[in-house]
């Protein structure tokens, strides 16, 4: 059974990494047990917001997930987050908590790199003015590359000799070296396919080793940039520089401290706030539902509206987790016992169970993942009781609501 996806949160000190993590993990609602068997000390549970299947069928009032929650058709799905500590220049050589940083990193399926785009903290998180946050993006990539590359080069002579003696494929040889980072053969093949004119492994020089490692990093460590502190006056110019330098990298503009502030006021009953949107209502808008705020807080909310919400459409926190799961190709799949009513059995609650699955996964593989390998699947059905083959693929809005019929055990 595949393990749950794990999103690593990285960032230098004072970048807003801890605040971002807090904003992603704040439940904001009474939530039941987690679906995960273990949560390590440096792991947390975040909540991915998606359009729930209940909204397709007008069943929002009946949607009661077993894990997470659903509000007005917005489902919040639990997902594991990893707080990756120790990010400082020189981490690859063990500086700071470098060894722990790199050991944590290899467990992550994707990274959210929190970048302070205000330019008010230097490479080590100390207060300054006019710092270029492009440096932070570059040295994170350099630290990972130097770590992987250094481990490879230390053994390169023996790697080449064994590769030649055993007549192994490049994929098999690299998998033997990269397996400790959580790689698998298809991942390595995809990384190699990106490289044009790749010579035989025994002819690789330092430049080719670097190119291979960089391509491997794109597969193993896909990264979303959380460009944080967007309400600072210097943020605009720094965001523009980053977008120009990294046009193909997924980037989301965020203000994590704003998100945490708004959620706190919402919990205390001072505002109505819909996460992931620009909408904030106060006592002046809803006097029957909300408590009044003092002028100082009201002025801060007005500034938040002007500098963040109306300008960017949201604080970006909901969107950054969506972007991380998107680069992994993960989509929600709903499993039900009754494909006609979408319930879990005899009750009236719908779409109780939801799993994150890679887009394009065969339906039969999903069935074995959910039901376990010890049962025999007699048939698989989707909306309307339509039978689907095990080879049919899961796609957004297609084969993403499934019911499994189990074959009776033979005597």
From Swiss-Prot:
Coiled-coil positions: none
Keyword annotations of the record: GTP-binding, Nucleotide-binding
Highest taxon of source: Eukaryota
Keyword match Heme: no
Domain OBG-type G: 5-274
Record's keyword annotation contains Cell cycle: no
PROSITE patterns: G_OBG
GO MF annotations, alphabetized: ATP hydrolysis activity; GTP binding
Binding site for GTP: 11-18, 83-87
Pfam families reported in the protein's UniProt record: MMR_HSR1 (PF01926), YGR210-like_G4 (PF08438)
Database matches in SUPFAM superfamilies: P-loop containing nucleoside triphosphate hydrolases (SSF52540)
Entry GO CC: cytoplasm
UniProt xrefs under PANTHER family: OBG GTPASE FAMILY, OBG-TYPE G DOMAIN-CONTAINING PROTEIN
Miscellaneous field: Present with 11600 molecules/cell in log phase SD medium.
Name of the protein in its database record: Uncharacterized GTP-binding protein YGR210C
Natural source organism: Saccharomyces cerevisiae (strain ATCC 204508 / S288c) (Baker's yeast)
């Amino acid at each position: 059974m595949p393990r749950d996806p794990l999103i690593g949160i990285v960032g230098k000190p004072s970048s807003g990494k801890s605040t971002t993590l807090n904003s992603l993990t704040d439940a904001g609602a009474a939530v039941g047990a987690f679906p995960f068997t273990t949560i390590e000390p440096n792991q947390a549970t975040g909540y991915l917001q998606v359009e729930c299947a209940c909204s397709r069928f007008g069943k929002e009032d009946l949607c009661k997930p077993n894990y997470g929650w659903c509000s007005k058709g917005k489902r919040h799905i639990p997902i594991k987050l990893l707080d990756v500590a120790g990010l400082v220049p020189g981490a690859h050589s063990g500086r700071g908590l470098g060894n722990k940083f790199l050991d944590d990193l290899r467990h992550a399926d994707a990274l959210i790199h929190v970048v302070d785009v205000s330019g008010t903290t230097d490479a080590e998180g100390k207060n300054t003015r006019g710092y270029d946050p492009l440096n932070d993006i570059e040295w994170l990539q350099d630290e990972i590359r130097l770590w992987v590359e250094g481990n490879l080069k230390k053994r390169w002579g023996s790697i080449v000799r064994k590769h030649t003696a055993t007549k192994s494929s490049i994929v098999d040889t690299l998998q033997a070296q990269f397996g400790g980072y959580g790689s698998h053969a298809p991942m390595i093949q995809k990384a190699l396919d990106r490289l044009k004119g790749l010579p035989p492994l025994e002819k690789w020089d330092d430049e080719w080793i670097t190119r291979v490692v960089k391509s491997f990093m794109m597969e193993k460590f896909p990264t979303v940039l959380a460009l944080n502190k967007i309400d600072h006056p210097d943020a605009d110019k720094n965001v523009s520089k980053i977008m120009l330098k990294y046009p193909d990298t997924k980037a989301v503009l965020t203000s994590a401290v704003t998100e945490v502030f708004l959620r706190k006021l919402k919990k205390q009953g001072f505002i109505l706030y819909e996460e992931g949107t620009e909408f904030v209502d106060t006592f002046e808008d809803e006097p029957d539902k909300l408590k009044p705020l003092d002028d100082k807080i009201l002025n801060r909310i007005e500034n938040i509206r002007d500098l963040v919400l109306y300008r960017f459409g949201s604080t970006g926190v909901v969107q950054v987790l969506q972007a991380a799961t998107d680069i992994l190709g993960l989509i929600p799949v709903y499993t039900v016992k009754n494909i006609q009513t979408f319930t879990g059995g005899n009750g009236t609650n719908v779409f109780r169970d939801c799993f994150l699955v890679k887009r394009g996964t065969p339906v039969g593989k999903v069935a074995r993942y959910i039901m376990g390998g010890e049962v025999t699947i007699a048939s698989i059905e989707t909306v309307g009781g339509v039978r689907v083959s095990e080879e049919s693929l899961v796609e957004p809005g297609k084969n993403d609501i499934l019911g499994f019929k189990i074959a009776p055990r033979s005597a």
